[in-house]
From Swiss-Prot:
Taxonomic path: Archaea, Methanobacteriati, Methanobacteriota, Thermococci, Thermococcales
Ribosomal protein found in the keyword field: no
InterPro entries referenced in this protein's UniProt entry, alphabetically: AdoMet_synthase_2_family, AdoMet_synthase_3, S-AdoMet_synthetase_arc
GO molecular function, one term: methionine adenosyltransferase activity
Highest taxon above the source species: Archaea
Name of this chain's protein: S-adenosylmethionine synthase
First-tier enzyme category under EC: transferase
PANTHER family per record: S-ADENOSYLMETHIONINE SYNTHASE (PTHR36697:SF1)
Gene from which the chain derives: mat
Pathway participation: Amino-acid biosynthesis; S-adenosyl-L-methionine biosynthesis; S-adenosyl-L-methionine from L-methionine: step 1/1
Cofactor: Mg(2+)
Length: 405
């Protein structure tokens, strides 16, 4: 496997590094955002099915559960505690093998349990009995296990199920780190213990204009945890101070932090929710409409439009190549001296082994004083090593060592 000659192209990228561009935009949709809920459920279902397939049959059977729709409900929030009038509707769809050698495999049971388990962790104030309806319409499939094993023996490296590409880059910019870590901290167990009123639907938008950063945070506040507007304003202040701490640990640039800017106290308008997610109030969510595999939405960077969440971790290059591109880029940025920025794009060809992409493009912006000539060989070797060991990604996914949104 290591002896293969792969089509890896390492070249210099001539463009202004993101940190030197005048305007940079960065977004993260928090785990309670409707789009992130869809991503999280889709991925939780895929991982649960994969683990159960391995447990029963020793191999991950074919499935894709990347079609999850969150249909917003209707709620009446009020200080001290409101109510959900119309529950959120969540549709699980896609495909999964349900018959194995005439033996029934409980796809829907596993999928529903995985979805509920995920929601319990992701949206703490969501009452699964009254606030949400989960409907599994995952399509059925059947398989001859002997045929599956014979195919796996013949092709130890899975064959790409699509002609598609993945994209990754490194390192993160200052603004990207701030946006990512602000949401992660506000949704951390540590912060929630101190401020249980802060819901999980937290969206962070970063704008850097020159050397000044604007950080806009929209955070759903749980109505049962705040009795009045004064309580609400105290929680907003806590969010502001927490974000300020993150910002100050990452940059010396002047930064403006804004929290829940749509509030209008004079009109009695506050961002309060019953559940901690705007999905209760008609906001819908879909897989792939939110964060990329590095957890961010970054219009200043190359991005793939593929939805990674819910795709099978064996042969679906829409998932595997996006993760792989990110890992290769991270290693090149960390291990190769003289790299200012690196962008990785990997293209598959349907039916070909996933360790032999049609092309693996590595584009490097060298640091001042460094030539691309001295960066090409180590960058090539890192990309080649990851491709030679591409099946490790499947294991990393099942062990929850990589995220996809």
């Amino acid at each position: 496997m290591a002896g293969k000659v792969r089509n890896i192209v390492v070249e210099e990228l001539v463009r202004t590094p993101v940190e030197m561009q005048k305007v940079e935009l960065v977004e993260r949709k928090g785990i309670g955002h409707p789009d992130s809920i869809a991503d999280g459920i889709a991925e939780a279902v895929s991982r649960a099915l994969s683990r159960e397939y391995v447990k029963r049959y020793g191999i991950i059977l074919h499935h894709n559960t990347d079609q999850v729709e969150v249909v917003g409900g209707r709620a009446y929030p009020q200080f001290g505690g409101g109510e959900v009038i119309k529950p959120i509707y969540i549709l699980l769809s896609g495909r999964a093998v349900e018959m194995v050698d005439r033996e029934f495999f409980p796809v829907h049971e596993i999928a529903l349990k995985a979805a509920k388990d995920y929601l319990r962790k992701a949206v703490r104030h969501l009452d699964l009995e009254h606030h949400v309806i989960i409907d599994s319409r995952i399509g059925q499939g059947s398989v001859d296990l002997v045929g599956v094993f014979n195919k796996a023996k013949k092709n130890p490296i899975p064959l790409a199920n699509d002609t598609s590409f993945g994209v990754g880059y490194a390192p993160l910019s200052e603004t990207e780190k701030i946006v990512l870590e602000t949401e992660k901290y506000l949704n951390s167990d540590e912060f929630k213990k101190k401020y249980p009123a802060v819901g999980e639907d937290i969206k962070v938008m970063g704008l850097r204009k020159g050397d000044e950063i604007d950080l806009t945070i929209a955070a759903a506040i749980v109505d049962s945890e705040v009795d009045n507007p004064d309580d609400y304003m105290a929680v907003k202040e806590a969010i502001y101070e927490a974000a300020k701490g993150i910002v100050e640990s990452h940059t010396e640039r002047p930064t403006n932090i804004y929290v829940n800017t749509a509030d209008d106290p004079k009109e009695g308008i506050y961002y309060i929710t019953v559940t901690g997610t705007s999905a209760e109030a008609g906001d819908d969510g879909s897989v792939g409409r939110g964060n990329r595999v590095n957890g961010l939405i970054t219009p200043n960077r190359h991005m793939s439009m593929e939805a990674a969440a819910g795709k099978n971790p064996v042969s679906h290059v829409g998932k595997i190549y996006n993760i792989l591109s990110m890992l290769i880029a991270n290693d090149i940025a960390e291990q190769v001296e003289g790299v200012e920025e690196v962008y990785v794009r990997i293209l598959s060809q349907i039916g070909k082994p996933i360790d032999e992409p049609l092309v693996a493009s590595v584009q490097i912006i060298p640091k001042k004083g460094y030539s691309i000539d001295v960066l090409q060989k180590p960058a090539y070797e890192i990309a080649d090593e990851w491709l030679a060991n591409i099946t490790k990604i499947q294991k990393m996914i099942l062990e929850d060592k990589v995220n996809v949104f």
